[in-house]
């Protein structure tokens, strides 16, 4: 392929990925299926279930048209290939065109099947039917969900492609092509995983995401996972009726201070250590009096007479956790992105130090 074709291919790949996974920039610009078809989809607040039935169907159709869009674009980007004359095109392009034509046809047939019987064939309608009473239908369940979603006390979090919504009766996970639904009175919740990232793209602070398994006692309801920021864990628990089991004993950091302590600990453990003689006994930490002091401040960040940090001559008097809490307490709470690079005074002698100067006693 020549330069225009290569440029178009790269640009179209980036556009397709962003159109499918919709980053914040695309949402702000309104380049989403929800925004482009807002007139047909209706309002999520008015009819949550019917909105997502239509949204998931429209999203599948829109995404299936992306290969055809690429082929049409290539007809203009590489006119010398004469792709518009399929019979003269290379075999690889013939296969691609066939796929680009069959894919939207197949999804159109599937969407048409879903729309029959007033959308009763849609996967979301069938999911709701599992929760319906014997003499009722999925529409009664949809009405209940629509009513509860309109209330302002619901719990809602997550990106548009993976939202978690909890109402008084229902736990729901909204993804690009489907909506998982479970009834609160029927579920067991278990924390299964935890991932910590050093920096959040939104706030430049450490962030922890936890994964919770939602399993229903109803055998027809498939289990699903929800993922949320650990700082929202407490709010989620308040909205749930069932307890959340932590079978893996995962430490959940519900505050910024908790996450900072974990990062502080990992950084200090990678620092220089401070050796003491075998006959020297460590005193209890004067901060908590629960464990022995195991931290000594030694200036390692720069040479002795350089920088703002100073040499501390105090004996070990603090444990790692208490020193981390002291370090966090002296920071600007409005700018957590500066915490790791700042200096604070020693809690005893007031000599300034940074994280690099914190040494574990061995």
Swiss-Prot record:
Keywords: Endoplasmic reticulum, Membrane, Metal-binding, Transferase, Transmembrane, Transmembrane helix, Ubl conjugation pathway, Unfolded protein response, Zinc, Zinc-finger
Taxonomy, superkingdom: Eukaryota
Subunit structure, as described in the record: Integral component of ER-resident dislocation complexes.
Cytoplasmic side: 28-56, 116-362
Residues annotated as transmembrane: 7-27, 57-77, 95-115
Membership in a protein family: Belongs to the TMEM129 family.
GO terms, biological process: protein ubiquitination; response to unfolded protein
Protein location: Endoplasmic reticulum membrane
Organism of provenance: Xenopus laevis (African clawed frog)
Pfam families from the UniProt entry: Tmpp129
Official protein name in the record: E3 ubiquitin-protein ligase TM129
Recorded domain comment: The RING-type zinc finger domain is responsible for E3 ubiquitin ligase activity.
GO CC, alphabetical: endoplasmic reticulum; endoplasmic reticulum membrane
Pathway(s) per entry: Protein modification; protein ubiquitination
Topological domain spans for side Lumenal: 1-6, 78-94
Zinc finger (RING-type): 285-350
Membrane disposition: Multi-pass membrane protein
Reactions that this protein is recorded to catalyse: S-ubiquitinyl-[E2 ubiquitin-conjugating enzyme]-L-cysteine + [acceptor protein]-L-lysine = [E2 ubiquitin-conjugating enzyme]-L-cysteine + N(6)-ubiquitinyl-[acceptor protein]-L-lysine
GO MF assignments: ubiquitin protein ligase activity; zinc ion binding
